[in-house]
Amino acid sequence: MTVEKIEAQLTNLEMQLTFQEDTIDSLNKLVTEQTQQMSEMQKQIRWLGKRLKQMQENQSTDSDPADEPPPPHY
């Protein structure tokens, strides 16, 4: 191999490395953002689960439908 070919290969490898480093940085930022989004969604799901449970408990503690007077058409 000539010196020129070795230098060209080295330059090519350096460019590939730079591109890969940039890609890794971009992917790392994306993973970080998605992790934050997932954490927020998990909080929202927990809140919704608690709210649903409260609503179900409130419904079950309401008066018995048999205790209510019949509708006016009876």
Swiss-Prot record:
It comes from the Bacteria. InterPro entries: SlyX. Residues 52-74 are annotated as: Disordered. Pfam families: SlyX. HAMAP family: SlyX (MF_00715). Belongs to the SlyX family. PANTHER family: PROTEIN SLYX. This is Protein SlyX homolog.
